[in-house]
Amino acid sequence: RKAGAIFIAKTNTPEFGLGSQTYNPVFGATGCAYDPSLTAGGSSGGAAASLALHLVPVADGSDMMGSLRNPGAYNNVIGFRPSIGRVPGEPGDEQFYSRLGVSGPMGRNVEDTIKLLCTMAGSAPFDPRSGFEDKLDVDAFRPKRFDEVKIGWLGDYGGYLETEPGILSRCEAGLAKMASNGGVVEPVSAEFDMTRLWKTWLDLRNWSRVAFWPFYDDPKKRALMKPELNWEIEQSRSITGADLYRAANTRSDWFRALNKLFDKYEFLALPTAQVFSFSKETHWPKSINDKAMDTYHRWMEVVIGPTLAGLPTANVPVGFDDRGRAMGMQIFGRFGEDRAVLELASAYEGIVDWLSIRPKLPS
């Protein structure tokens, strides 16, 4: 508001912001801007769809498990998850141990996303992780020169992640475009036990549901809550202090593993999603390539790596499949290198035309 923003509305989100499919019993499901029969993704599905449809110029949201990145990919817009602390948290948040979610911007292009980030970023006395030394200035951003860029492509973590056919190839085509413009792109291995990282994710995410115990303990309220939230709350009941200690150490080990890669590569890349947008009547994919998903959010495992490391991550578009479904790619850099990530995203935007393909509205 101090920067002159006009707040228009709160767009649709899933119940308690859980899941990358925007549906709830109040407003129903939000359709993708390009095909309203498909999901807009989530949890900022309403924000991404409204952006793509030109209902708003920019939108903000939060991102724990891809809530800015996933709907950005499905609606062919930019979604940016900043470094932890770049945008101050809420005054009542737990500020030290369990920080997974952050607030960030979305835009129809990188320039607008940068402008909103510079408005949102800053320091706050209630957030000890805020107040980066490099104060973001809109006028200081410049598109990266590709001949100065080296990117490590993590892909599906060496076959660990199931991905719908067509996703990896579209990401690789986008990377090839950067390489043809002078960038260096190489496949890399994280050299990490990804099953260990998933266990860490479950423990830390489920533990955060302790805050919902009072709702769960009220039978009338519990009966109204979505089953996925009740499941997470039930899982949180059995998490021990030792589990959290191990999870914290695994998270630190993962951060160090990525920093080793950053010694060689300025940026790393992953797909933004493991499946293309699906029917908005389906709450979540039960399988990918006939492999069963054992939790309601396993199909979004690809986004937890940047989250657990707290790294700045941009979703950029990589095009559409033969059914017209959009997909995106995550580009992320070292902690605190938000500007560099967005400068690479800006350079990439300049060599592809995916963002110019807007939804066709009924006449």
Regions found by a protein language model. Give the residues of each.
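Acyltransferase
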Residues: 163-190, 213-220, 244-265
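Short, surface-exposed loop/helix-turn segments at secondary-structure junctions
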Residues: 130, 199, 246, 278-300
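A short helix-breaking turn/cap at a secondary-structure junction
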Residues: 78-173, 346, 351-363
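A short, well-structured catalytic beta-strand-centered motif of the EAL phosphodiesterase domain
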Residues: 329-335
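Short glycine/serine-rich loop segments
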Residues: 2-123, 307-328
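Short, solvent-exposed turn/loop segments enriched in Gly/Ser/Thr/Pro and often Arg
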Residues: 11-19, 192-194, 272-274
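Charged, often glycine-rich, active-site loop that binds/positions anionic groups
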Residues: 24, 28, 197-212
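Short helix-loop capping/hinge segments that flank enzyme active sites or metal/cofactor-binding pockets
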Residues: 1, 143-155, 204-259, 271-276, ...
